[in-house]
Amino acid sequence: MHQFTLAEIARGLADKSFSSEELTRALLARIKQLDPQINSFISVTEDLALGQARAADARRAAGETGALLGAPIAHKDLFCTNGVRTSCGSKMLDNFKAPYDATVVAKLAEAGMVTLGKTNMDEFAMGSANESSHYGAVKNPWNLEHVPGGSSGGSAAAVAARLLPATTGTDTGGSIRQPAALTNLTGLKPTYGRVSRWGMIAYASSLDQGGPLARTAEDCALLLQGMAGFDAKDSTSIEEPVPDYSANLNASLQGLRIGLPKEYFGAGLDPRIAELVQASVKELEKLGAVVKEISLPNMQHAIPAYYVIAPAEASSNLSRFDGVRFGYRCEEPKDLTDLYKRSRGEGFGVEVQRRIMVGTYALSAGYYDAYYVKAQQIRRLIKNDFMAAFNDVDLILGPTTPNPAWKLGAKSSDPVAAYLEDVYTINANLAGLPGLSMPAGFVDGLPVGVQLLAPYFQEGRLLNVAHRYQQVTDWHTRAPNGF
């Protein structure tokens, strides 16, 4: 059963080939057996899962239907889950049990999904390798000496290892799409405001967005259907009708205009990845797409702008973790200042402390205009570049990452080298656009992804193109040895 996609599970549950409880028990056993090799879970919620599975079976027996009813899910460990540890991969929240469900968790539970656990992640979602977690690094199932990408590395590794068919992730600068590329998955970052952020512990509030990780575009469509929608509890949620994401998966690509930004194919891109991207372009041309070169002239400014804006927002968001109301508290503080200083110094890891310091500096009185205001101006230029490009093309295509997965620890001492791995993904977050990564081949036995970007609220078109591509290629069907 572990080889089934989410769509296959939906069909199997509907025709009563197996029950949700049988499926849940099989996957829980598989997690217990295999997860110690990859460390993709922080918490496994066995009792919760079995209770939800029995409830889903009862709902189905009573005549209820639904693609997600009784299907398994695991949540990135920054989605609050009622009564379950929600740690953000940090010592700071190691003892925090959320008193409520995040909107995403609640919506998927209402749809009947079964929560198998909470997945490992870079601490407070800050990282590109899933090495900064308090609970240890996650390993890439394709090569256990390599990283799975981040920050949703646990969510990606769990699906790649066939521990379950789909997981939730979040994407602030590429944290769904980059691990999807490095583990041979399909990962979708929706339009900013498409999926509620209520109960999703914040890193950078103007950039964070939740989305699905799965093996196929068809599965991402099913999961996004359950996640998307307006939420009055989230002030950044957008009141836009949610289409049927599965309805147009098979639509023709005849005449679809795809733009290849010339800036995506310059220095820094592994030439073998460039070849795989061009091969995927040829497949889409065979399906009827028309491809042309375009320009995104301000792309080179994206990383510096992002690494001012995101840490600035993080320094503000993470100021709430002070050892007073919840989270880690240091032993025997001498006074209030000592409580704050030691609780934060001991509770946060090195990368989180680095970004808090950078953000605080960028927001300080003497530097606010020089850094934060300037970064927001660059953000506007990047958005304008995309708007101009989408006057000429329907979608933008390029590599998801400049390199395949690197070895564990290879970039730990050089944070900027790791930051540069997000060079192709950050732009979509700065502009708030939807983006999808899909499997496109292998380099040295390690997966490579191709990224598609679309105008606002065109997730359906991204899923359509990825699905048609996956009907004529088999990269997404390949599984790592031993899993």
Swiss-Prot record:
Catalyzed reactions per annotation: L-glutamyl-tRNA(Gln) + L-glutamine + ATP + H2O = L-glutaminyl-tRNA(Gln) + L-glutamate + ADP + phosphate + H(+)
Alphabetical list of SUPFAM superfamilies matching this protein: Amidase signature (AS) enzymes
Keywords noted in UniProt: ATP-binding, Ligase, Nucleotide-binding, Protein biosynthesis
Gene3D superfamilies, A to Z: Amidase signature (AS) domain
EC primary class: ligase
GO CC field: glutamyl-tRNA(Gln) amidotransferase complex
HAMAP family the record matches: GatA
Function: Allows the formation of correctly charged Gln-tRNA(Gln) through the transamidation of misacylated Glu-tRNA(Gln) in organisms which lack glutaminyl-tRNA synthetase. The reaction takes place in the presence of glutamine and ATP through an activated gamma-phospho-Glu-tRNA(Gln).
Protein name per Swiss-Prot or TrEMBL: Glutamyl-tRNA(Gln) amidotransferase subunit A
